[in-house]
């Protein structure tokens, strides 16, 4: 089968940095144990499973404050998605060692919100409800940040302020953000724009929007909780016009999707381990509709191959 390996795809620098920070923590014998990650360090189950083998445990829950209630001692790692100042304060009050793996692009948004608060602004924040990144951003200044996800959310806004700015979650579809921003502009003509789609997300979406047009089908390799992975599938269908499926790894690929398909495009979310994506590509390249011996969708990547290699500190 012909395979279009969409480029760029896969890991972004924020994800790699977060994983290296957590991996270094696992090797640092001076850190108090146990070591916990507040939520998924990045949204990929293969990564969290690999860290568990390294002795770092992922705690999950509805929000970061609830997760933090589960921890009474040891070390906590804040994920790439960022956390609110309240989470940081409570971790300190509990006497926990805190390690910050927040993506620099997310930190930039937090700093923008703080700056706008000091200037007397209200902030309309476009993001996915229930996702940890908006949770942290809203938590920076909950009294002035208004989270919107849908057209209905914009209609329900009631902000009485001449100082108003609109920004967004870094991993949203740039087309979705544009549409919501236009609705906000209609309602509040005086609003200022500050689009925060991170460059890695933007170039991956643009690559899919162009390169997937040449394919009969797009496979996005990414975790179901990965917002940027889900958005890549959306971009393939809505912008490139190519049917797309998201899979966590090769074992989730269904052969019936490949019926009548001659060319398939493959991309991966920013939190998807490269070996997982390569395994999918290898399978598709050798796949033959007429040869059942090429039809086995068995995932065989060991967890020890998932995490980046770092040197132990002396």
Swiss-Prot record:
Keywords: 4Fe-4S, Iron, Iron-sulfur, Isoprene biosynthesis, Metal-binding, Oxidoreductase. The active site is at residue 133. InterPro entries: LytB/IspH. Its EC number is 1.17.7.4. Its cofactor is [4Fe-4S] cluster. [4Fe-4S] cluster binds at residues 12, 103, 198. It comes from the Bacteria. Isopentenyl diphosphate binds at residues 43, 81, 131, 226, 228, 271. One of its GO terms (cellular component) is cytosol. It catalyses: isopentenyl diphosphate + 2 oxidized [2Fe-2S]-[ferredoxin] + H2O = (2E)-4-hydroxy-3-methylbut-2-enyl diphosphate + 2 reduced [2Fe-2S]-[ferredoxin] + 2 H(+); dimethylallyl diphosphate + 2 oxidized [2Fe-2S]-[ferredoxin] + H2O = (2E)-4-hydroxy-3-methylbut-2-enyl diphosphate + 2 reduced [2Fe-2S]-[ferredoxin] + 2 H(+). Transmembrane segments: none annotated. GO terms for biological process: dimethylallyl diphosphate biosynthetic process; isopentenyl diphosphate biosynthetic process, methylerythritol 4-phosphate pathway; terpenoid biosynthetic process. Pathway: Isoprenoid biosynthesis; dimethylallyl diphosphate biosynthesis; dimethylallyl diphosphate from (2E)-4-hydroxy-3-methylbutenyl diphosphate: step 1/1; Isoprenoid biosynthesis; isopentenyl diphosphate biosynthesis via DXP pathway; isopentenyl diphosphate from 1-deoxy-D-xylulose 5-phosphate: step 6/6. It holds the Pfam family LYTB. Binds 1 [4Fe-4S] cluster per subunit. It is an enzyme of class 1 (oxidoreductase). The keyword Iron-sulfur applies. (2E)-4-hydroxy-3-methylbut-2-enyl diphosphate binds at residues 43, 81, 131, 170, 226, 228, 271. GO terms for molecular function: 4 iron, 4 sulfur cluster binding; 4-hydroxy-3-methylbut-2-enyl diphosphate reductase activity; metal ion binding. Dimethylallyl diphosphate binds at residues 43, 81, 131, 226, 228, 271. NCBIfam families: ispH_lytB, PRK01045.1-1. Catalyzes the conversion of 1-hydroxy-2-methyl-2-(E)-butenyl 4-diphosphate (HMBPP) into a mixture of isopentenyl diphosphate (IPP) and dimethylallyl diphosphate (DMAPP). Acts in the terminal step of the DOXP/MEP pathway for isoprenoid precursor biosynthesis. HAMAP family: IspH. Belongs to the IspH family. This is 4-hydroxy-3-methylbut-2-enyl diphosphate reductase. It comes from Bacillus subtilis (strain 168). The lineage of its organism: Bacteria, Bacillati, Bacillota, Bacilli, Bacillales. The gene is ispH.
């Amino acid at each position: 089968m012909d395979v279009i390996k969409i480029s760029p795809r896969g890991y972004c620098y924020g994800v790699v940095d977060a994983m290296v920070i957590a991996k270094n923590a696992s090797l640092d014998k001076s850190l108090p144990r146990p070591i916990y990650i507040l939520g998924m360090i990045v949204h990929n189950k293969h990564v969290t499973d690999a860290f568990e083998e390294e002795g770092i445990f992922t705690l999950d829950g509805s929000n970061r404050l609830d997760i933090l209630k589960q921890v009474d001692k040891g070390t906590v790692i804040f994920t790439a998605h960022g956390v609110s100042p309240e989470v940081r304060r409570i971790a300190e009050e509990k006497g926990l060692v805190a390690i910050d793996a927040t993506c620099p692009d997310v930190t930039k948004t937090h700093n923008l919100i703080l700056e706008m608060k000091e200037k007397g602004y209200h902030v309309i924040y476009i993001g996915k409800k229930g996702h940890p990144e908006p949770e942290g951003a809203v938590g920076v200044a909950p009294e002035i940040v208004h989270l919107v996800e849908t057209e209905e959310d914009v209609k329900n806004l009631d902000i009485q302020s001449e100082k108003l700015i609109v920004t967004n979650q870094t991993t949203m579809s740039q087309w979705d953000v544009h549409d919501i921003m236009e609705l906000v502009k209609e309602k509040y003509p005086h609003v200022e724009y500050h689009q925060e789609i991170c460059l890695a997300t933007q170039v991956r979406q643009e690559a899919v929007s162009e390169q997937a047009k040449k394919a009969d089908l797009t496979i996005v390799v990414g975790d179901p909780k990965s917002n940027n992975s889900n958005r890549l599938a959306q971009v393939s269908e809505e912008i490139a016009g190519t049917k797309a499926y998201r899979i966590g790894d090769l074992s989730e690929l269904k052969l019936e999707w490949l019926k009548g398909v001659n060319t398939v495009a493959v991309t991966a979310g920013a939190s998807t381990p490269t070996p997982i994506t390569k395994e999918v590509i290898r399978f598709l390249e050798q796949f033959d509709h007429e040869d059942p011996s090429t039809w086995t969708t068995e995932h065989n990547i060991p967890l020890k191959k998932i995490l980046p290699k770092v040197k132990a500190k002396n």
